[in-house]
Amino acid sequence: MTWSQEYFVNREDVRLYVYRKRDAAPQVGEAAKPVLLLVHGSTVSGRNTYDLQVPGGKDYSVMDYFADRGYDVWTVDHEGYGRSSWSGRGNSDVPTGAQDLAAVVPFILKETGAEKINIFGSSSGALRACMYTEAHPETVARLGLSALVYTGAGSPTLEQRRKKLPEYSTSPRRKVDLAFYEGMFNRDKPGSSEDSVPKAIAAAELPLVSEVPTGTYVDMCANLPLAHPEAIPCPTLVIRGEYDGIAAEPDLLDFFARLPTKDKQFVVLSGIAHNPMMGVVRNKFHHAL
């Protein structure tokens, strides 16, 4: 049984929902545990990405997995997602997400007593994590990335998404529903995840939101590259799912080659599509991270 706690951290007038899990409640005077901050993508909030509870399923919660292994695990809902507030300004793009992280990380360091965090992001969350690390390298021990897009070259998903770029560019939010979540998991490789997963996401997300921001979609279609590997000094892990339609392998290898650190790994996981933590073979993702 894990211990959990909810917080709110302010970035200007935006209230950011922050969620934490450990194997037990913190005790006065104890040594700091290693901290892992998990950064969500374009559609599903932090808690419902990384602490998803799937009826009849097991090991879907990345937070539980790493809490059980001694980590102090955190996630945040970015502006306009989940339980966080929405200012009505902008569209919660990738740079705004990096600003969210810049507001949250000092709070995490104060609460935990840690000097640095380990940070992992998936999809547009990987871009947010990169941008944060570039701006605040002194706070990041290790960086993990999955479903990353660098220049966007060779990405069939982005090629299709660009057809709706005029719509995304003129509206700050887009609608989500069960059908949309189901499409997310059938887009790359039908059968790579259980049908119960999008249903569990809908049950968790739709009581909170019926729309999510468009900013990261616009950024990934029109404003790449947003990550600058030459400016990332820390040890870095890049994970690509075999069937991921966003993360084209040559594009990622170009990113990987530009990382200055010699402490780096590039991992391709067979049987996995765009959402590695929610696939049938999610144990491979857990092992890699």
What are these regions (language model features)?
Residues 272-284:
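Catalytic histidine-centered segment of alpha/beta-hydrolase-like enzymes
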Residues 1-30:
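N-terminal cap/lid segment of alpha/beta-hydrolase-fold proteins
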Residues 154-239:
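Alpha/beta-hydrolase
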Residues 115-120, 124-152:
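Conserved hydrolase catalytic core segment
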Residues 259-275:
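Catalytic histidine neighborhood in serine/cysteine hydrolases
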Residues 98-116:
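Conserved acidic catalytic loop of the alpha/beta-hydrolase fold
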Residues 25-71:
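Short, surface-exposed "cap/lid" segments of acyl-processing enzymes
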Residues 245-251:
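Conserved alpha/beta-hydrolase "acid-adjacent" motif
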